[in-house]
Amino acid sequence: MIKNAFISFQEKKEESKGSVEFQVFSFTNKIRRLTSHLELHRKDYLSQRGLRKILGKRQRLLAYLSKKNRVRYKELIKQLNIRELKTR
């Protein structure tokens, strides 16, 4: 699975599971799982709420990473195949 490949990639860089990149990756996996679940169960409102909460957490982490280190942010966005944050 993708997660195992990413974990080995992270271990090569000797970063902990508490790193921003790993947290964003974990949230992205949860988001993809919940999205596929909600395609089957459209009226599962608790899962919809959980999805919105996880999306918010990931968005805040990405905003933090974007401010702190733009290069790592760009690499992560490209690697996870997600869109960039909207800027105001």
Curated annotation (Swiss-Prot):
Tell me where in or outside the cell this protein is found. Plastid, Chloroplast
| UniProt keywords, alphabetically | Chloroplast, Plastid, Ribonucleoprotein, Ribosomal protein
Lineage: superkingdom: Eukaryota
What Gene Ontology cellular-component terms does the record carry?
chloroplast; ribonucleoprotein complex; ribosome
Keyword Ribosomal protein belongs to the record: yes
Q: What is its main location?
A: plastid
Q: Which Pfam families match?
A: Ribosomal_S15 (PF00312)
Q: Which family does it belong to?
A: Belongs to the universal ribosomal protein uS15 family.
- What HAMAP family would the database entry show? Ribosomal_uS15_B (MF_01343_B)
PANTHER family xrefs: RIBOSOMAL PROTEIN S15, BACTERIAL AND ORGANELLAR, SMALL RIBOSOMAL SUBUNIT PROTEIN US15M
Which protein is depicted? Small ribosomal subunit protein uS15c
Protein species of origin: Lobularia maritima
Ranked from the top, the taxonomy reads: Eukaryota, Viridiplantae, Streptophyta, Embryophyta, Tracheophyta
Q: Which gene encodes it?
A: rps15
